[in-house]
């Protein structure tokens, strides 16, 4: 029986390929659709209307308009780290460990 972490890994892979389709990469439009559906709170809370363009520029290392799985995973890892940092700060403020 798969562990929670194995399920999380599977979810990341399936989510990427759901939006990438057969081409094995995300276009800017694919990335926008993924972010709007899978991370709605992130885009809703952005004050910068160019946030998605900046994310795409950061992830598109080859400057070919494509985001591969490794870059997608870097985005998810960065968001997870930021969420963890926020969680840790607020848990400490509440006196929890």
Curated annotation (Swiss-Prot):
Highest taxon of the source? Answer: Eukaryota
Q: Which Gene3D superfamilies match?
A: EF-hand (1.10.238.10)
Q: Where is this region: Ancestral calcium site?
A: 60-71
Please state the span of the N-terminal signal peptide per the UniProt entry: none
A Pfam family annotated for this UniProt entry: S_100
* Molecular-function GO term, any one: calcium-dependent protein binding
Q: Which residues form the EF-hand domain?
A: 47-82
Gene Ontology cellular component?
cytoplasm
Is the Repeat keyword given for this protein?
yes
Transmembrane keyword on record = no
Q: What binding partners and quaternary form does the record give?
A: Heterotetramer containing 2 light chains of S100A10/p11 and 2 heavy chains of ANXA2/p36.
Q: What more does the record tell us?
A: Does not appear to bind calcium. Contains 2 ancestral calcium site related to EF-hand domains that have lost their ability to bind calcium.
* Function field: Because S100A10 induces the dimerization of ANXA2/p36, it may function as a regulator of protein phosphorylation in that the ANXA2 monomer is the preferred target (in vitro) of tyrosine-specific kinase.
Name of this protein: Protein S100-A10
What species is this protein from?
Gallus gallus (Chicken)
């Amino acid at each position: 029986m798969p562990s929670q972490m194995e399920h999380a890994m599977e979810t990341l892979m399936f989510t990427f390929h759901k939006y990438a389709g057969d081409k094995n990469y995300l276009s800017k439009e694919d990335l926008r659709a993924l972010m709007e559906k899978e991370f709605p709170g992130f885009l809703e809370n952005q004050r910068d209307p160019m946030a998605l363009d900046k994310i795409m520029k950061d992830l598109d290392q080859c400057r070919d308009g494509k985001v591969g799985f490794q870059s997608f995973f870097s985005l998810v890892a960065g968001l997870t780290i930021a969420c963890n940092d926020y969680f840790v700060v607020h848990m400490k403020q509440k006196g929890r460990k």
